[in-house]
Amino acid sequence: MEDFVRQCFNPMIVELAEKAMKEYGEDLKIETNKFAAICTHLEVCFMYSDFHFINEQGESIIVELDDPNALLKHRFEIIEGRDRTMAWTVVNSICNTTGAEKPKFLPDLYDYKENRFIEIGVTRREVHIYYLEKANKIKSEKTHIHIFSFTGEEMATKADYTLDEESRARIKTRLFTIRQEMASRGLWDSFHQSERGEETIEERFEITGTMRRLADQSLPPNFSCLENFRAYVDGFEPNGYIEGKLSQMSKEVNAKIEPFLKTTPRPIRLPDGPPCSQRSKFLLMDALKLSIEDPSHEGEGIPLYDAIKCMRTFFGWKEPYVVKPHEKGINPNYLLSWKQVLAELQDIENEEKIPRTKNMKKTSQLKWALGENMAPEKVDFDDCRDVSDLKQYDSDEPELRSLSSWIQNEFNKACELTDSIWIELDEIGEDVAPIEHIASMRRNYFTAEVSHCRATEYIMKGVYINTALLNASCAAMDDFQLIPMISKCRTKEGRRKTNLYGFIIKGRSHLRNDTDVVNFVSMEFSLTDPRLEPHKWEKYCVLEIGDMLLRSAIGQVSRPMFLYVRTNGTSKIKMKWGMEMRRCLLQSLQQIESMIEAESSVKEKDMTKEFFKNKSETWPIGESPKGVEEGSIGKVCRTLLAKSVFNSLYASPQLEGFSAESRKLLLVVQALRDNLEPGTFDLGGLYEAIEECLINDPWVLLNASWFNSFLTHALR
């Protein structure tokens, strides 16, 4: 084969092929088929470019004889055949002068007429299989692919063959001649069978042995091996094909694929009705903390001790009274419950030794608030099989609620910085590999951006409350245990701080199944007057319990202190996820990492430092009615974290449904923005599925409103 190559190809091509093989550490004495393939590919690239010029008027012309007077520019820039460094220099230069998008892999040519890079393929197999492998490897709409085979077939992106028929015929004839010459020397069969598919990163992880046999056995009919199936799936063109398949399925199935244009989508319809109300398990932006700095009291770290110490820092207690009643509740019971907490805390202080936990007396007000004896008696199903009118409870449809401005304010507040540090920089030991060094550097930069964030405070508060409540639910099943709502942080100066937000009283908690509910009453301090946004506090009874002196620009001012009381409930599975809220930090860090990776792959070096250090650069954060909002990288980190935290705090079936269904519409819109000419069927059904999830949940309604802003600006 080596002798044939040296006889059959131009010496310049042979020399370039030798260099290329040397660069990749391949021995042409052994890899003779590869040597022949490289020479063939080089020759096709040169023939593609030969005789094609652009004249002074910018028109593409074919000139077969050199005319020394003609001021002509080569139509194609040849990249194939250069050493890697030089080839990338040429590519970068083309991108800088023409504004073309930089390809991830080295292409073969650049077409100055069509302003696009071209990837040339020469295959001994079927052209469509090889085309799909190329497309799967390149994954770029911008690079044009043109495949030739030794049998005279060809395939190109969007059937755009770039060259005139005569130029292409010349290439096909040359390939056919090479094939015949090889066949006459008995070399063709070996050459034909030696072609391997395009190597992509994923395919280098070879599946072998039993797993390989299982993969090959598990293929759909008509596929001989995993590679063919992979190539088919990766290059699958759905439009048209789906339509045909559906029509074969059933006479009733009728799906006409409609083109999805800029004018096609309409905004998502948000429900009308009274404004939505707060439904989180604890107060967010409205919470007030009673704090102690540098705690060193006896029993420090025991929640009840810490809570009593924090309560002692406030001196403005007064006779409590209801300022905003709960419409459906017995408000005097909420008032009596708070008075009972104060009285029982006072009793503890009068004891010689403070106990580690406090179980509340089972008073009538607490029994009512915690739903004691309210659950209907359970009857074994076998005992009532014969009851003729056995049926489920009639339950009312939930009332539709409209979006209210308070949830956007809550989100904005969650993105802000506080004056405390809520998470420590984890020390995980020395890095032993370069990748560990990059990973810990990214983690440290990210931690620095979010450690002061209010969303991080919500994480630590959520972790503490859920852990304490789950522990108490298991350890004191029959007791009405008093659980302080506590968090710990550091001041800017590094001093430790313990904060008390209020109290929870837990009801009976015989939790056998993950979804069994434990009721609790929450009592939380706040300076927010509930009468300003009464719709937000529909589920709460709010008491005024004291006056707090605050420092302001005009000196000390007195502000009323409120207590937000409500009955609530949670389950083992919800508490388990609440305890794991730190995962939100990981999720948002991974999103930032993918942004850094994208930037690093373009620049071909790790961009972590530049990413966080370049304070002048702004990044897109989200959509608002004003347009695309931008901010610093720190703001992006905090916004992504806040979104993740709110997904946890406001988790619900409505959110699950909206996220899954709206994502489908988002993907279609993204495809339209990428000029992929998407098609859809039953778009009305998709809108129905999305809008079915918009009932009364504030976080879902806000996300739907953001989605509408995105639609408006994405389709301009």
From Swiss-Prot:
GO CC annotations on file:
host cell cytoplasm; host cell nucleus
Q: How is the cofactor bound?
A: Binds 2 manganese ions per subunit.
Q: For binding Mn(2+) 2, which residues are annotated in this chain's numbering?
A: E80, D108
Q: Which residues form the signal peptide?
A: none
Enzyme Commission code(s) on record: 3.1.-.-
Motif Nuclear localization signal 2 (NLS2) extends across: 184-247
Q: Report residues binding Mn(2+) 1.
A: H41, D108, E119, I120
List required co-factors: Mn(2+)
Annotated InterPro entries: INFV_PA, PA/PA-X, PA/PA-X_sf
Q: Write down the superkingdom of origin.
A: Viruses
User: Pfam families this protein is in?
Assistant: Flu_PA
* Localization in the cell: Host cytoplasm; Host nucleus
Q: What does this protein do?
A: Plays an essential role in viral RNA transcription and replication by forming the heterotrimeric polymerase complex together with PB1 and PB2 subunits. The complex transcribes viral mRNAs by using a unique mechanism called cap-snatching. It consists in the hijacking and cleavage of host capped pre-mRNAs. These short capped RNAs are then used as primers for viral mRNAs. The PB2 subunit is responsible for the binding of the 5' cap of cellular pre-mRNAs which are subsequently cleaved after 10-13 nucleotides by the PA subunit that carries the endonuclease activity.
Subunit text: Influenza RNA polymerase is composed of three subunits: PB1, PB2 and PA. Interacts (via C-terminus) with PB1 (via N-terminus).
**In which family does this protein belong, per the annotation?**
Belongs to the influenza viruses PA family.
User: This protein is called what?
Assistant: Polymerase acidic protein
From what organism does this protein derive? Influenza A virus (strain A/Ann Arbor/6/1960 H2N2)
This chain is encoded by the gene named PA
